[in-house]
C-alpha cells in the first residue's frame, strides 16, 4: 500500500513539475507574442480595426522608408527571438500551435518585404492601403464618431501616396501598374460618390465641413496617383511579374507551410482538372441530353430569378441549406444568429458577385454578419441584366451560398468565435484553409445529397462542377505563370479552354493571377481537407462521423492544414502527407 502511495505521489509531483514547466514556457512565449502583436497593429492599424480591436481606431498607415525599414528589422528580430526560444520543448500543445502560427505569420510578412518586394514592386499595395469601408460596414459606434476616424484617414491619404512614390523601383510589372491605376481611380470615385452618400446623414455641420475638405483632398490625391502611374510608370513597366520557381517554393512554405514542389502540385492539379471535366460532362448529359457541356450549362443559366426576386429567393434558399446541415448532421451550428442577406452596398459592387462580410473575432458591438448579393443595375441593358441573373441561376446561387455561408465562411466564422483558441489563432488565418474549407463545402454538400437525385441532382452537380473547374484552373495557371513564364494571354486562353469562360472574365482571372498567386489555395486547400478527412476516418473507424470531422477541423481556428494534421491525427508518420 505504501509503495502504491509513493508511486501515486511521485506521479502527482512529476505532473505538477511538468505543468509548472509548461506554464513557465507558455508565459515566456506569450510575452514575446504580446510584444510582437502590439507593434504589429501599430504599423497596420486598419487590420486591427477590421479584427474588432478599436484601440487602433483613427490611427493611419505610414509607408515612409524609415517606417518600412524599421518594421522589416522588427520582423527579423522577432523571427530570431522565436527561433532561439530556449523553452520551446516545454510549451504546451496549444502554445506550440500558436508558436508555429506566429512564426508562419512573420515569415509570410518577411516574404512580402524581401522576396515579392511588395513595397518596391507593387503599386497596388499603396492604391488599396486605405480601407475607408472598415469604418462604414459595422455600427460599432455612432456614425459621427466613425466619421471622425474617416476624416483622419482622408487627411493622411495625400502624404501617404506622395511618400509611396519614393519606394517604387522601376521597372514595375505592367499588370500591377494597370490594376493599381484602376484601383486608385475606383477609390477616388468611391470617395466622391459613395462615401459622401454613406455619411450624409451626420447632422454635425462642423464635422461635415471637415469631412468635405478632407475628402476632396483625398479624391484629388488618388486621381493624381493614378495619373502619375499612367504617365511615369506605365511606359517603363515590363511583364516580369512572375515569382520564379525558387521564390514560389518559399511563398508556399511561408504562406501555408506547404513543402510539396510546385511541379508535383501542378501534376495533381492537371489530373484533377481532367477528372472534374469528366464529372462536368457526365452531369451535362443528364441535364441536356445530346447537347455539349457548355450548352447544358447555358440551359441551366436560363433558370434564374427575376431581378425583384433575387434577394428574397437567396434568403429563402439560404434557410433551406441551413436546415439541411441540421437534418443531415453535417456540422454543429454554434449560434442561432443568421447572416443577413442584403444587396451589396453600392460602394462595394465593383467586381463583387456575392460575398460574406463577418465581423472581426474581437468585435463586441457591431456584430452583424452580412451575406451580400450584388443586384442588377437599373441602367444596364436587358441583355446585361439577363446575363447577370443567369450567373445567379437557382443552382449556382445555392452553391455560392454553400461557399459563402452554410457551411462555408459564415459557419467557419461562428466556430472561430465560439472556439477556445487563442488570440493568435483568431488573428492569423491560412488562405488555404479558409478558402479551401468554403470550396470543399460545395462538393461535400452535393456529395451528401443536397439537391436530391435524378435531374435536379445532376443540375446541382453541374453547377458545383462549374465552380470547381474555375478553381482548378486557378491552381494550374498560378504555377504556370509564376514558375513557367506563362503570359497573361496564354493564361486567358487556358481559362477559356478548360473552364469554358468567355474572353473578358477569363482575362480578369488571368490578371488576378499576376498579383495573387495564392488563388491556387482554393483547390489546394480543398484537396488537403479531403485527404485529411480520409485519414481521420481511417483513424477513427467506428467512432467516425462527418460531423465529428467538421467540428474538429473548425474548432482549431483557421490554421494551415499541415498543422491541423498534427492536431487531429495520432500517427506522426503521416503528418507531412498533406495531399
Show where each model-derived region lies.
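Positively charged n-region of N-terminal signal peptides that target proteins for export
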Residues: 1-5
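N-terminal maturation segment of proteins
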Residues: 21-579
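Bacterial N-terminal signal peptides
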Residues: 6-16
Amino acid at each position: 500500500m505504501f509503495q502504491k502511495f509513493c508511486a501515486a505521489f511521485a506521479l502527482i509531483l512529476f505532473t505538477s513539475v511538468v505543468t509548472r514547466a509548461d506554464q513557465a514556457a507558455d508565459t515566456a512565449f506569450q510575452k514575446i507574442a504580446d510584444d510582437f502583436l502590439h507593434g504589429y497593429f501599430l504599423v497596420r492599424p486598419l487590420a486591427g480595426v477590421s479584427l474588432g480591436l478599436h484601440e487602433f481606431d483613427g490611427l493611419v498607415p505610414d509607408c515612409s522608408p524609415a517606417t518600412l525599414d524599421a518594421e522589416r528589422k522588427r520582423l527579423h528580430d522577432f523571427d530570431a527571438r522565436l527561433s532561439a526560444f530556449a523553452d520551446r520543448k516545454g510549451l504546451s500543445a496549444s502554445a506550440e500551435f500558436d508558436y508555429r502560427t506566429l512564426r508562419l505569420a512573420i515569415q509570410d510578412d518577411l516574404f512580402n518585404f524581401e522576396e515579392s518586394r511588395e513595397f518596391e514592386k507593387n503599386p497596388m499595395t499603396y492604391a488599396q492601403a486605405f480601407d475607408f469601408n472598415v469604418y462604414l460596414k459595422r455600427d460599432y459606434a455612432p456614425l459621427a464618431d466613425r466619421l471622425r476616424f474617416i476624416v483622419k484617414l482622408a487627411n493622411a491619404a495625400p502624404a501617404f501616396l506622395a511618400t509611396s512614390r519614393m519606394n517604387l523601383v522601376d521597372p514595375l510589372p505592367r499588370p500591377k501598374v494597370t490594376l493599381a491605376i484602376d484601383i486608385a481611380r475606383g477609390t477616388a470615385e468611391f470617395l466622391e460618390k459613395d462615401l459622401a452618400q454613406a455619411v450624409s446623414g451626420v447632422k454635425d455641420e462642423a464635422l461635415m465641413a471637415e469631412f468635405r475638405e478632407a475628402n476632396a483632398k483625398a479624391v484629388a490625391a488618388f486621381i493624381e496617383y493614378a495619373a502619375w502611374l499612367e504617365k511615369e510608370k506605365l511606359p517603363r513597366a515590363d511583364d516580369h511579374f512572375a515569382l520564379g520557381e525558387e521564390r514560389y517554393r518559399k511563398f508556399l512554405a511561408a504562406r501555408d507551410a506547404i513543402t510539396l514542389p510546385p511541379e508535383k502540385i501542378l501534376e495533381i492539379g492537371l489530373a484533377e482538372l481532367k477528372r472534374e471535366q469528366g464529372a462536368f460532362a457526365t452531369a451535362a448529359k443528364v441535364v441536356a441530353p445530346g447537347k455539349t457541356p457548355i450548352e447544358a450549362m447555358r440551359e441551366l443559366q436560363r433558370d434564374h430569378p427575376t431581378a425583384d426576386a433575387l434577394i428574397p429567393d437567396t434568403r429563402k434558399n439560404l434557410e433551406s441549406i441551413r436546415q439541411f446541415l441540421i437534418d443531415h448532421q453535417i456540422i454543429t451550428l454554434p449560434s442561432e444568429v443568421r447572416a443577413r442577406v442584403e444587396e451589396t452596398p453600392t460602394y462595394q459592387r465593383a467586381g463583387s458577385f456575392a460575398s460574406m462580410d463577418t465581423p472581426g473575432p474581437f468585435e463586441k458591438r457591431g456584430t452583424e454578419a452580412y451575406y451580400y448579393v450584388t443586384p442588377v443595375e437599373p441602367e444596364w441593358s436587358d441583355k446585361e441584366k439577363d446575363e447577370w441573373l443567369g450567373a445567379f441561376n437557382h443552382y449556382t446561387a445555392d452553391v455560392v451560398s454553400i461557399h459563402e455561408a452554410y457551411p462555408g465562411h459564415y459557419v467557419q466564422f461562428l466556430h472561430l468565435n465560439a472556439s477556445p483558441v487563442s488570440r493568435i489563432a483568431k488573428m492569423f488565418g491560412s488562405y488555404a484553409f479558409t478558402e479551401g474549407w468554403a470550396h470543399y463545402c460545395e462538393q461535400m454538400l452535393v456529395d451528401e445529397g443536397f439537391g436530391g437525385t435524378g435531374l435536379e441532382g445532376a443540375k446541382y452537380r453541374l453547377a458545383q462542377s462549374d465552380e470547381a473547374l474555375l478553381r482548378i484552373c486557378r491552381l494550374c495557371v498560378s504555377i504556370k505563370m509564376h514558375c513557367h513564364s506563362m503570359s497573361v494571354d496564354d493564361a486567358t486562353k487556358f481559362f477559356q479552354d478548360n473552364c469554358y469562360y468567355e474572353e473578358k472574365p477569363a482575362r480578369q482571372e488571368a490578371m488576378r493571377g499576376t498579383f495573387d498567386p495564392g488563388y491556387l489555395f482554393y483547390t489546394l486547400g480543398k484537396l488537403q481537407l479531403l485527404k485529411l478527412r480520409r485519414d481521420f476516418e481511417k483513424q477513427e473507424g467506428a467512432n467516425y462521423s462527418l460531423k465529428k470531422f467538421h467540428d474538429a477541423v473548425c474548432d482549431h481556428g483557421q490554421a494551415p492544414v499541415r498543422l491541423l494534421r498534427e492536431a487531429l491525427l495520432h500517427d506522426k508518420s503521416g503528418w507531412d502527407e498533406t495531399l
